[in-house]
């Protein structure tokens, strides 16, 4: 089979003039990250490729045990990884500065870069992007992986980025997965998760939420941003600067002030007594309403950045009627909760239905409890058999201590995986004897247990909670 004018057809081998040099050429970057892609139905492979883009960068990700080899190429092309231009020594790694960045200074053995004057120089200063907010509210963080005084070789990796570990794409965690049902808790793609994952923070991520406060010119007068707010609790005002804006580094919880703001009251809102006192005492404070920006209900985080824009600033264009605009960026830790969406790389997605205590999870003969329980009915009709092959090879990989490379359209056969399982003292069918964690009784049938890379997608339950007081 060959392609002629983009159409596949059967031709004589002597007429073939060109040859694809890589199996990855057939698919895009996302699809080339799916191991055993050739064993997945096309619709599920498409879902898997799309969901790779929706994954949350985890606080401590781990590279997949079963990988395709394209992970490092994708990470290198992301633009977040910085590499040494030549052999040299790290002079310093500066902490995060006021602008939210940090720097790595390298002293190369030979002149490798040009300085500000255009002369060749041995010293190279690299600026890093730390704790920036992406359009999906996730964290963009170029983490230094070198330290001061360390020797580096040419092309050695100096930084990791979001979803990158040791210069390789790491979008999830390698978890022990069992394919079995558990009292209906994994009915219709629901997922049962062990409390161990929540306790260790294996699937924890950080969201950076942006809260905006605008002072406008109204009919009744100008709104003012100030720390001098009447009838407000002193403990809430303590975190504000003299300008009325929360300090960077402050830990804020629900209802706490981010920006203090007063808005002029309409005439009809004042009682006759207030009007009289206002006339006699000429009190402006009582003529203002407290419209401060507060932390929303149920949220808790740390203020990492504050941006202030004013009409007086040169080169700043604000909307008509806006006098001042304050943006407060708060880093919020998102722990794994019921309702979060998890997915593998084969379009096998689901929602966490319950987080069971570690001791209640099914366990193996050696006492190891499983981390995740998936429904076996999610495999036959979806025809994404790649997840089963990943489970088995991941299980063999865990016991051998080696990672398994499975390039797209060039992966190993089921017989090879079975041989690898046998070589590591495991059953050829990939099944294990499993005991019920609640009763200690052995399950009637043996269960497929393996290791799969599981991602947390950017559809978090905490961000989707809505409430209505009426209607």
Predicted regions and their residues:
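Long C-terminal interaction/binding lobes of large macromolecular proteins
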Residues: 282, 389-471
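Conserved nucleotide-binding/hydrolysis micro-motifs of P-loop NTPases
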Residues: 183-185, 310, 335, 348-349, ...
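Flexible glycine/proline-rich, aromatic-decorated loop/lid segments
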Residues: 119-132, 352-371
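Long, charge-dense accessory insertions within large macromolecular proteins
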Residues: 1-147, 153-336, 340, 417, ...
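Structural and coupling elements of P-loop NTPases
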Residues: 169, 184, 197-202, 346-349, ...
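A short beta-strand motif that forms part of the nucleic acid-binding face
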Residues: 108-112, 183, 195, 264, ...
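Conserved actuator
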Residues: 268, 344-351
């Amino acid at each position: 089979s060959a392609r002629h004018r983009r159409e596949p057809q059967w031709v004589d081998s002597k007429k073939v003039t060109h040859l694809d040099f890589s199996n990855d050429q057939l698919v895009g970057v996302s699809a080339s990250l799916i191991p055993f892609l050739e064993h997945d139905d096309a619709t599920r492979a498409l879902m898997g490729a799309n969901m790779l883009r929706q994954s949350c960068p985890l606080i401590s990700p781990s590279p997949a045990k079963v990988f395709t080899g394209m992970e490092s190429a994708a990470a290198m092309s992301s633009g977040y990884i910085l590499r040494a231009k030549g052999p040299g020594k790290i002079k310093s790694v500066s902490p995060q500065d006021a602008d939210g960045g940090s720097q790595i200074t390298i002293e190369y053995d030979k002149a490798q870069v040009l300085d500000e004057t255009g002369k060749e120089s041995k010293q190279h200063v690299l600026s890093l992007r730390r704790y920036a907010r992406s359009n999906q509210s996730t964290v963009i963080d170029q983490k230094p992986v070198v330290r001061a005084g360390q020797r580096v070789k040419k092309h050695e990796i100096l930084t990791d980025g979001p979803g990158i570990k040791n210069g390789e794409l790491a979008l999830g965690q390698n978890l022990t997965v069992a394919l079995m049902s558990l009292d209906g808790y994994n009915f219709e793609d629901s997922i049962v998760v062990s409390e161990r994952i929540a306790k260790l923070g294996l699937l924890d991520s950080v969201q950076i939420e942006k809260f905006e406060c605008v002072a406008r010119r109204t009919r009744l007068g100008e709104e003012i941003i100030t720390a001098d707010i009447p009838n407000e609790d002193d403990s809430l005002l303590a975190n504000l600067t003299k300008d009325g804006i929360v300090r960077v580094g402050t830990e804020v919880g629900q209802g706490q002030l981010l920006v203090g703001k007063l808005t002029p009251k309409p005439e009809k809102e004042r009682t006759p007594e207030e009007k009289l006192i206002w006339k006699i005492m000429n009190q402006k404070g009582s003529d203002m309403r407290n419209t401060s920006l507060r932390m929303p209900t149920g949220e808790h985080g740390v203020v990492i950045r504050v941006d202030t824009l004013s009409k007086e600033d040169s080169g700043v264009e604000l909307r008509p009627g806006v006098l001042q605009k304050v943006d407060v960026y708060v880093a919020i830790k998102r722990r794994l909760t019921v309702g979060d969406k998890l997915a593998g790389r084969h379009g096998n997605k689901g929602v966490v239905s319950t987080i069971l205590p570690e001791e209640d999870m099914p366990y193996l003969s050696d006492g190891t409890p499983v981390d995740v329980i998936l429904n076996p009915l999610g495999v036959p009709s979806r025809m994404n058999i790649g997840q089963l092959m990943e489970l088995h090879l991941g299980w063999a990989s865990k016991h051998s201590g080696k990672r398994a490379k499975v390039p797209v359209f060039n992966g190993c056969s089921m017989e090879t995986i079975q041989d690898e399982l046998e070589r590591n003292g495991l059953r050829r069918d990939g099944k294990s004897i499993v005991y019920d964690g609640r009763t200690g009784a052995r399950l009637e049938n043996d269960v497929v247990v393996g290791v799969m890379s599981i991602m947390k997608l950017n559809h978090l339950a905490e961000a989707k909670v809505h409430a209505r007081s009426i209607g």
